[in-house]
Regions:
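Secretory targeting signals
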Residues: 1-4, 15-19
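Netrin-like (NTR/C345C) domain of secreted extracellular proteins
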Residues: 4-11, 25-27, 100-187
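Basic, polyanion-binding surface patches
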Residues: 11-12, 26-136
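C-terminal segment of classical bacterial N-terminal signal peptides
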Residues: 19-25
Length: 187
């Protein structure tokens, strides 16, 4: 094995430093855009909820043992398709932590305790609710007075972003977002 010259070592280290300084973090999670219309039409309930408590446990999904988190939420307001909705619902998301073991599912909605959000929900045959479109169906509310819809914390890169529900809703005031959503509900 040959020796490395001092000049070669310095050039190599400098190249590595420059590459790491100007590199961009790669993201492997990419999803197709859900339009606002598709999100509204595909949802069973569209509500403002606040997470009250959550519990993670193992569940058999597709013949594999996975961690899921069940979050008890309080329904603060029905925006659309909310007739007969209970005051509290159980919402299941993929991933979570049990003791020292954790499982993260990129692109999943993160229901944060005591943080109100707009949630586009599906209801499974088991009676549990699920966030439609994962993070594309979850919008944390920001601000005290006029609340605005924010971007979900674990939202991945979205293909065709300009036609997405995220583009249409993030930054909107809750009242105007609710009106846009209700206008898309078909009887």
């Amino acid at each position: 094995m040959g020796q490395v010259s001092r000049r070669g070592l310095i050039v190599g280290l400098a190249s590595g430093a420059v590459a790491s300084t100007f590199s961009v973090t790669a993201s492997a999670t990419i999803v197709r855009a859900l339009s606002l219309s598709a999100l509204v039409q595909g949802s069973r309930r569209i509500v403002v909820v606040t997470a009250l408590a959550s519990e993670s446990h193992f569940e058999e999904l597709g013949r594999r043992r996975r961690i899921v988190t069940d979050t008890r939420v309080r329904v603060e307001e029905g925006l659309a398709k909310a007739d007969g909705v209970d005051r509290e619902l159980l919402v299941r998301t993929l991933g979570g932590a049990i003791g020292d073991l954790g499982e993260r599912v990129h692109g999943q909605a993160q229901l944060v305790l005591d943080e109100p959000c707009v949630a586009f929900l599906l209801q499974g045959p088991d009676g549990l609710h699920y966030v439609n479109g994962m993070a594309q169906g979850h919008y944390p509310l920001r601000g005290a007075g006029t609340r605005k819809l924010g971007r979900s914390a674990d939202l991945p890169e979205i293909l065709d972003f300009n036609n997405s529900a995220v583009k249409a809703l993030v930054g909107s005031e809750l009242g105007s977002a609710g009106a846009r959503i209700r206008a898309l509900v078909t009887p």
